[in-house]
Design a protein with these regions (language model features):
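One-carbon transfer enzymes
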Residues: 1-225, 267-270, 276-278, 300
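An anion-binding loop in the catalytic cleft
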Residues: 210-300
């Protein structure tokens, strides 16, 4: 018997999950998304409209109204992915089996809103996806399923998000059915090894040329596409979205050659994709056509 569920999600990470549930014949009674900009549809909104699933924007909906609507749906479960809103206890307890979150890390490491970016920034070699039954804490609920994934040196926030969302889609689809049929159980989440993943700030994404080339690459990858790793050059903020490590040395922050190789605390990096303020992202060759600098200059 297909499970009757609601889906709560907003960003790109949520789309493969709702797509998998839809294709696996879950009965998605309602989709909820959070969108403060009425002129731009969220990725989940787009999917809901394409598949003719009723969709509500909760940005302008109070908790009482949301609960009453959930109550009337008589759901067996709610799946929550990259939603952007904390659910009250009465909503968490309303569905027959509960509310389940697809989280982009191997919990309890990186509880919080930015687990994928934090895992890259910290230099983790491995991360994962965890399905938890939600409680009132921040990613503290019991674990339904988890699966690890390798972080490649080339992984950006976007590529790792894509990888983990596919894993999460498989995990939730398979294990939610198992739970409803009493073929699996929940496991209490450990507290040992807990870390917290707060949102990456613009100040954190500023490149510190005193640090190693590897660390700078992690900042670039974790900040791609948002907020974008950046540096100042003659008063202008320039963002780097992709770069490579180069085996050259020099004082940190010095432009070493005509290809804009910049020295770091050890070795150097060469940007591959950059963006000037208010301009579009360009590859290094096109960028250099309109960007003048002098070899030997120090970047702020």
């Amino acid at each position: 018997m297909a499970l009757r569920i609601a889906f709560m999600g907003t960003g790109n990470f949520a789309v493969p999950v709702i797509s998998k549930l839809y294709n696996n014949k879950f009965v998605i009674e309602k989709v909820y998304t959070k969108n403060v900009n009425k002129n731009i549809k969220t990725p989940v909104q787009v999917f809901a409209e394409k598949t003719s699933i009723p969709c509500t924007n909760v940005s302008f909906m109070d908790d009482v109204s949301l609960f009453k609507e959930i109550q009337n749906l008589k759901l067996e479960a709610i799946v929550v992915v990259a939603f952007g809103r904390i659910l009250k206890k009465n909503i968490l307890n309303e569905p027959k089996f509960g509310c389940f979150n697809v989280h982009g890390s191997a919990l309890p490491r990186w509880r919080g809103s930015a687990p994928i970016q934090r895992s890259i920034l910290a230099g983790d070699r491995e991360t994962g996806v965890t399905i938890i039954k939600m409680d009132e804490g921040i990613d503290t609920g019991p674990i339904l399923a988890t699966k690890n994934a390798t972080i490649e040196n080339s992984d950006t926030y976007t590529t790792l998000e894509n990888k983990l969302s596919q894993i999460g889609a498989e995990l939730i689809s398979e294990n939610l059915i198992k739970l409803s049929q009493s073929e699996t159980t929940l496991k209490k989440q450990e507290e040992t090894g807990t870390t917290y993943a707060k949102k990456i700030s613009k100040s954190e994404s500023k490149i510190n040329w005193e640090t190693s080339a590897n660390q700078i690459l992690r900042v670039i990858n974790a900040s791609n596409p948002s907020p974008g790793a950046w540096f100042n050059y003659k008063g202008e903020r320039i963002k780097i979205f992709e770069a490579q490590k180069i085996d050259k040395v020099g004082n940190p922050g010095i432009i070493l050659d005509s290809e804009l190789t910049i020295s770091c605390g050890d070795n150097s990096i060469q940007p591959i994709q950059l963006q000037r303020a208010g301009k579009k992202i360009l590859n290094i060759n096109d960028f250099l056509l309109g960007f003048k600098f002098s070899v030997g200059e120090k970047i702020n």
